Amino acid sequence: MSDFDIAKTTSPASRLVLGSTSRYRRELMQRLCIPFDVAAPDVDETPQDGESPHDLACRLALAKARAVAALHPDAVVIGSDQVADLDGEPLGKPGTHERAVAQLQRMRGRTVVFQTAVAVVCQVA
Protein backbone atom coordinates (compact mmCIF):
# COMPACT_ATOMS: atom_id res chain seq x y z
CA MET A 1 0.00 0.00 0.00
CA SER A 2 1.44 3.39 -0.98
CA ASP A 3 1.41 6.52 1.16
CA PHE A 4 -1.30 7.91 -1.10
CA ASP A 5 -3.48 4.82 -0.53
CA ILE A 6 -3.08 5.22 3.23
CA ALA A 7 -4.00 8.92 3.06
CA LYS A 8 -6.94 8.12 0.83
CA THR A 9 -8.38 5.60 3.29
CA THR A 10 -7.90 7.76 6.38
CA SER A 11 -8.82 11.18 5.02
CA PRO A 12 -12.43 12.41 5.27
CA ALA A 13 -12.05 14.23 1.94
CA SER A 14 -12.68 11.81 -0.88
CA ARG A 15 -10.86 13.53 -3.74
CA LEU A 16 -8.54 16.26 -4.92
CA VAL A 17 -9.71 19.05 -7.24
CA LEU A 18 -7.53 21.57 -9.04
CA GLY A 19 -9.42 24.85 -9.25
CA SER A 20 -7.85 26.12 -12.43
CA THR A 21 -8.28 26.16 -16.19
CA SER A 22 -4.53 26.54 -16.74
CA ARG A 23 -3.09 23.73 -18.80
CA TYR A 24 0.30 24.40 -17.18
CA ARG A 25 -1.06 23.88 -13.67
CA ARG A 26 -2.81 20.73 -14.83
CA GLU A 27 0.46 19.44 -16.30
CA LEU A 28 2.29 20.19 -13.04
CA MET A 29 -0.31 18.24 -11.08
CA GLN A 30 -0.10 15.31 -13.50
CA ARG A 31 3.62 15.03 -12.77
CA LEU A 32 2.73 14.12 -9.18
CA CYS A 33 0.91 10.98 -10.40
CA ILE A 34 -1.92 11.64 -7.94
CA PRO A 35 -5.46 11.40 -9.27
CA PHE A 36 -7.31 14.72 -9.37
CA ASP A 37 -10.23 16.42 -11.05
CA VAL A 38 -10.25 19.88 -12.61
CA ALA A 39 -12.90 22.56 -12.09
CA ALA A 40 -13.01 26.07 -13.50
CA PRO A 41 -13.25 28.76 -10.80
CA ASP A 42 -15.62 31.65 -11.44
CA VAL A 43 -13.60 34.51 -9.97
CA ASP A 44 -13.27 38.17 -10.95
CA GLU A 45 -9.53 38.70 -11.40
CA THR A 46 -9.66 42.50 -11.45
CA PRO A 47 -6.99 43.99 -9.17
CA GLN A 48 -8.27 46.12 -6.31
CA ASP A 49 -7.08 49.72 -6.06
CA GLY A 50 -3.56 49.82 -4.64
CA GLU A 51 -3.29 46.02 -4.44
CA SER A 52 0.26 44.75 -4.81
CA PRO A 53 1.00 41.91 -7.23
CA HIS A 54 1.84 39.67 -4.25
CA ASP A 55 -1.44 40.43 -2.50
CA LEU A 56 -3.36 40.01 -5.76
CA ALA A 57 -1.87 36.56 -6.36
CA CYS A 58 -2.68 35.48 -2.79
CA ARG A 59 -6.23 36.84 -2.91
CA LEU A 60 -6.97 35.20 -6.26
CA ALA A 61 -5.49 31.82 -5.27
CA LEU A 62 -7.69 31.72 -2.18
CA ALA A 63 -10.76 33.01 -4.02
CA LYS A 64 -10.35 30.33 -6.69
CA ALA A 65 -9.93 27.57 -4.11
CA ARG A 66 -12.98 28.77 -2.14
CA ALA A 67 -15.14 29.14 -5.27
CA VAL A 68 -14.41 25.58 -6.38
CA ALA A 69 -14.69 24.20 -2.83
CA ALA A 70 -18.21 25.62 -2.60
CA LEU A 71 -19.15 23.43 -5.58
CA HIS A 72 -17.15 20.41 -4.38
CA PRO A 73 -17.55 20.28 -0.57
CA ASP A 74 -16.28 16.69 -0.42
CA ALA A 75 -12.90 17.58 -1.91
CA VAL A 76 -9.56 19.05 -1.05
CA VAL A 77 -9.30 21.95 -3.50
CA ILE A 78 -6.13 23.59 -4.74
CA GLY A 79 -6.34 27.11 -6.12
CA SER A 80 -3.42 29.07 -7.47
CA ASP A 81 -2.55 32.22 -9.30
CA GLN A 82 0.46 33.93 -10.77
CA VAL A 83 0.85 37.66 -11.34
CA ALA A 84 3.63 39.34 -13.27
CA ASP A 85 5.15 42.10 -11.15
CA LEU A 86 6.90 45.01 -12.86
CA ASP A 87 8.23 47.37 -10.19
CA GLY A 88 5.31 46.66 -7.87
CA GLU A 89 2.66 46.97 -10.56
CA PRO A 90 0.65 43.92 -11.65
CA LEU A 91 0.80 43.15 -15.36
CA GLY A 92 -2.39 41.57 -16.61
CA LYS A 93 -2.91 39.37 -19.62
CA PRO A 94 -2.50 41.63 -22.64
CA GLY A 95 -5.44 40.21 -24.58
CA THR A 96 -4.32 41.47 -27.99
CA HIS A 97 -1.17 41.25 -30.05
CA GLU A 98 -0.72 45.01 -29.93
CA ARG A 99 -0.98 45.13 -26.14
CA ALA A 100 1.41 42.19 -25.85
CA VAL A 101 4.00 44.03 -27.93
CA ALA A 102 3.54 47.18 -25.83
CA GLN A 103 3.89 45.16 -22.63
CA LEU A 104 7.07 43.47 -23.86
CA GLN A 105 8.56 46.83 -24.87
CA ARG A 106 7.77 48.19 -21.43
CA MET A 107 9.52 45.22 -19.80
CA ARG A 108 12.64 45.45 -21.98
CA GLY A 109 15.77 45.78 -19.84
CA ARG A 110 13.81 45.52 -16.60
CA THR A 111 13.29 42.73 -14.11
CA VAL A 112 9.87 41.12 -13.99
CA VAL A 113 9.06 38.98 -10.95
CA PHE A 114 6.29 36.40 -11.05
CA GLN A 115 4.36 36.35 -7.79
CA THR A 116 2.90 32.87 -7.36
CA ALA A 117 0.42 31.79 -4.70
CA VAL A 118 -1.21 28.48 -3.83
CA ALA A 119 -4.19 27.97 -1.53
CA VAL A 120 -5.66 24.71 -0.28
CA VAL A 121 -9.23 24.54 1.01
CA CYS A 122 -10.89 21.53 2.60
CA GLN A 123 -14.36 21.90 4.08
CA VAL A 124 -14.57 18.32 5.35
CA ALA A 125 -14.24 18.10 9.11
Identify the residue ranges that each predicted region occupies:
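Anionic-ligand binding patches
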Residues: 2-17, 30, 53-125
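N-terminal G-site helix/loop of the GST-like fold
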Residues: 13-39
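Short loop/turn and capping residues at structural boundaries
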Residues: 39-40, 115
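Short, acidic/turn-prone active-site loops that include or flank metal/cofactor-
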Residues: 40-46
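A short, surface-exposed loop/turn module that caps and links secondary-structure elements
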Residues: 47-52
